[in-house]
């Protein structure tokens, strides 16, 4: 990995409070329902604290099942419905997703309990930070860009060892709404972590995360965590929202050649996530997209990375 500039892992978006829903824009649940959700969330946080202690001693299959179950249960406690479309490959892979909210972490872990790459600040988040550390999250110190090559090597080693890894290569959250071109983080998908997939010979699987309000049938930024917004304010919006749905769409895997350019690989993944052409996206000559398969019932030996069978899995809140 080449030397990096001081702003490589300090990306920023153009989002501000205007990107968040206006008062009354998103249907809400009554106050008693919000209180019940908060009680449920508190229960899941307590369970998560206990789980963080157990994770290091659990065998890998049980550890992955526990993390997946906790992530799904916590999303349900917040009143969020999770919809999963597609199926992950059976090989260990680098999972890359767009970044809108802190809920993205729960959504990804609910699909596949992978090792995450996250900013150092996540370590201080209540319970989620403890779980992240216990699950082997690779924390990125964005104030020390010269440490990035070592971080990429850690991700490469994890992939070579057969452990899937998930990363949000935009490096920051943004609204990703229609007409939000000015909000897009400068540089789009950062290419550094894609080098790990190339070096490890691992496929790259783009994940598309989208939030919508089932009541209105439209996309919403109610769950977004943007700009000067605080984690508590963002959580309060989620707890109050009526029928909030997060969908995780698993796109076709990209199989980079050994001599692939990480920048082109990043552009190709970004194009798959945002469903629009990105300047400089790689061609089939250097990347080999393989359509994802859908099965009715996987064999008993299906690796832990593979999520529940079926074209669409709807986990109702």
Where are these regions (language model features)?
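Soluble, non-transmembrane catalytic domains of enzymes that act on hydrophobic metabolites at membranes
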Residues: 1-24, 81-85, 179-192, 196, ...
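Compositionally biased, charge-rich terminal segments
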Residues: 2-45, 215-224
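A transmembrane-helix-recognition feature enriched in membrane-embedded lipid enzymes
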Residues: 22-83, 130-135
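Catalytic core of membrane glycerolipid acyltransferases/transacylases, capturing the structured
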Residues: 46-60, 76-77, 93-145
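Residue-level preference for the first positions of well-ordered beta-strands
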Residues: 92-94, 137, 162-168, 203, ...
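Hydrophobic/aromatic ligand-binding patch that stacks against planar heteroaromatic rings
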Residues: 107-108, 131, 157, 195-197
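A cross-family acyltransferase "interaction/gating" segment
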Residues: 127-129, 175-260
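Long, non-transmembrane cytosolic or organellar matrix-exposed soluble domains/tails
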Residues: 237-317
């Amino acid at each position: 990995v080449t030397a990096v500039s001081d702003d490589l892992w300090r990306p920023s978006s153009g989002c501000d409070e205007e990107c968040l829903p206006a008062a009354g824009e998103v249907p809400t649940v009554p106050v008693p329902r919000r209180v019940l959700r908060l009680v449920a969330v508190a229960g899941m946080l307590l369970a998560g604290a206990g789980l963080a202690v157990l994770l290091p001693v659990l065998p890998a299959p049980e550890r992955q099942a526990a993390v997946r179950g906790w992530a799904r249960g916590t999303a349900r406690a917040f009143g969020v419905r999770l919809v999963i479309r597609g199926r992950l490959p059976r090989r260990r892979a680098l999972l890359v997703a767009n970044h809108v909210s802190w809920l993205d972490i729960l959504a990804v872990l609910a699909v596949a309990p992978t090792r995450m790459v996250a900013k150092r600040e996540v370590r201080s988040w209540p319970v989620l930070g403890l779980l992240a550390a216990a699950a082997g999250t690779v924390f990125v110190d964005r104030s020390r860009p010269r440490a990035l090559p070592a971080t990429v090597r850690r991700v490469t080693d994890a992939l070579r060892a057969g452990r899937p890894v998930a990363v949000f290569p935009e490096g920051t959250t943004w609204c990703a709404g229609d007409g939000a071109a000015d909000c897009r983080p400068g540089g789009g998908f950062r290419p550094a972590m894609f080098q790990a997939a190339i070096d490890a010979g691992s496929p790259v699987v783009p994940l598309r995360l989208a939030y919508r309000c089932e009541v209105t049938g439209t996309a919403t930024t109610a769950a977004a965590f943007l700009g000067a917004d605080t984690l508590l304010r963002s959580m309060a919006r989620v707890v109050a929202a009526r029928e909030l749905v997060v969908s995780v769409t698993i796109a076709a895997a990209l199989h980079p050649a050994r001599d692939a350019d990480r920048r082109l690989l990043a552009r190709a993944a970004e194009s798959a996530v945002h469903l629009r052409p990105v300047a400089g996206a790689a061609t089939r000559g250097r990347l080999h997209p393989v359509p994802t398969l859908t099965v009715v019932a996987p064999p008993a030996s299906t690796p832990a990375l593979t999520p529940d069978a079926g074209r669409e899995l709807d986990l109702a809140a």
